[in-house]
A protein has these predicted regions:
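P-loop NTPase switch/coupling surface
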Residues: 1-145
Length: 145
């Protein structure tokens, strides 16, 4: 089951929330219900963003910084603005697959579990680029429809 751990983010000082298929948040006004919902949406959408980025850039290899860290940092700031206090948020997709975001010493740090990094390292540059760059265009057969 997915889980989120939030420390010192907005109105939430310390929370660990299990995330079933259906989650009902009840509480006083300004207690952090919307913040929790927005964080859950944000982290769930990262998984989709990650997959899209892996398939979107076929002309080069992939890098952790350019293909995940920088876009995630930008997206976080779009969603929540620039932080003004130290915080840490960890989202558990599974027991061993996590993404953490923390603000420490005026830096927004993004960390992911090793399994995500292994996936990125395992994505090779597409082989067809080598083929096309070494082939004369007149040698490529035309396909008529």
């Amino acid at each position: 089951m997915q889980r989120i751990v939030i420390q010192n983010f907005g109105p939430i000082k310390d929370a660990t929330i299990e995330i079933p298929k259906f989650l009902l948040l009840i509480g006083e006004q300004a207690s952090g219900k919307s913040t929790v919902a927005k964080l859950i949406y944000f982290f769930r959408s990262l998984k989709e963003d990650f997959t899209k980025r892996m398939y979107k850039q076929p002309t080069r290899g992939y890098s952790w910084k350019n293909d995940f860290e920088v876009p995630t940092r930008q997206k976080f700031i779009q969603f929540f603005g620039r932080p003004n206090q130290q915080f840490e948020i960890t989202f558990y997709y599974t027991h061993s697959n996590t993404v953490s975001i923390k603000w420490d010493n005026k830096t927004l740090c993004i960390e992911m579990s090793d399994i995500f990094k292994k996936i990125l390292r395992g994505v090779p540059k597409p082989q067809y680029i080598v083929l096309v760059s070494n082939t004369n265009s007149s040698d490529i057969p035309r396909i008529e429809r």
